[in-house]
């Protein structure tokens, strides 16, 4: 073999050895980098898990520290006078007085089934099944928030009650976590009926009315126990946005929302086909008798 051939042969082998060494080095670097990344991910996962567990443990006993039967609420006061048109001495209601909130408490058994079914159908259809938190809706709300960047209501009636009682409405994960654990603990302390009764007596139903009794008085001139299905649906539809769905201010918007409530009640089997048709027909010509802000005065002493 000539010297030039030997040199070529040796050179080619050196190149192959060098390439192999380089590939081997790159492989080692890649493995080392991957190993480091996995280690970082594991450590991060442990830190996040420990932090999450610690956060949950710190929140698990979170409660409202409120007694649903002793809430400090503003109530409407009434002025009565002796009957002027007859010889009886029975007092007649002359005027209702209230300041910032028009509210008349009504017991659970005085609230018609139609009102209870309407509010549950539109606000929290799994109310009677969950333990304070509807995890399917909560997951849907979180998914929507991260995928579309928009909010989606995931709060149950229990959670909404807590928000109304505490006044905590800031948008933060900490507040939402507190609300969740408060809801879980509230349902351990009170029955579904007690929670629903409190909700229906506390929440805002637009035009200064708080609670279903005040809403029925304002919009229909009657007690809530005398309201029919269509009227209850009109009241229930207000809660999502009292300013936008007040029948005194936006009757058309209220009618559309009312019909959405009726559709939900029908789809969920809360009303029959005949009741649905009657209520839908009534919704087309609803009459509201109230006057916005009637008898509202400032700084009225509340007495019962």
Give the residues covered by each predicted segment.
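Juxtamembrane regions of bacterial inner-membrane/periplasmic proteins
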Residues: 2-304
């Amino acid at each position: 073999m000539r010297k030039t051939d030997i040199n070529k042969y040796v050179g080619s082998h050196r190149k192959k050895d060098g390439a192999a060494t380089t590939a081997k080095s790159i492989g080692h670097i890649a493995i080392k980098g991957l190993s480091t990344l996995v280690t970082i991910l594991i450590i991060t996962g442990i830190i996040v898990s420990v932090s999450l567990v610690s956060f949950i443990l710190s929140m698990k006993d979170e409660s409202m520290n409120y007694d649903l039967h002793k809430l400090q609420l503003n109530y409407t006061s009434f002025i009565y006078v002796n009957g002027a048109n007859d010889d009886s001495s029975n007092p007649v209601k002359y005027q209702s007085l209230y300041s910032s909130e028009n509210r008349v408490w009504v017991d659970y058994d005085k609230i018609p089934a139609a009102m209870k079914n309407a509010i549950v159908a539109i606000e929290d259809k799994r109310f009677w099944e969950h333990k304070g938190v509807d995890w399917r809706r909560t997951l849907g709300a979180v998914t929507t928030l991260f995928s579309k960047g928009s909010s989606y209501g995931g709060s149950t009636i229990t959670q909404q009650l807590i928000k109304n009682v505490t006044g905590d409405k800031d948008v933060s994960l900490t507040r939402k976590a507190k609300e969740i654990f408060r809801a879980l603990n509230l349902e351990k302390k009170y029955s579904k009926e007690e929670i629903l009764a409190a909700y229906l007596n506390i929440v805002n139903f637009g035009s200064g009315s708080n609670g279903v009794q005040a809403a029925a008085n304002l919009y229909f001139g009657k007690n809530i126990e005398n309201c029919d299905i269509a009227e209850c649906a009109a009241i229930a539809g207000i809660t999502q946005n009292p300013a936008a769905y007040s029948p005194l201010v936006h009757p058309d918007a209220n009618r559309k929302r009312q019909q959405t409530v009726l559709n939900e009640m029908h789809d969920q089997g809360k009303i029959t086909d005949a009741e649905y048709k009657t209520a839908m027909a009534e919704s087309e010509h609803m009459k509201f008798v109230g006057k916005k802000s009637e008898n509202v005065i400032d700084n009225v002493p509340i007495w019962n």
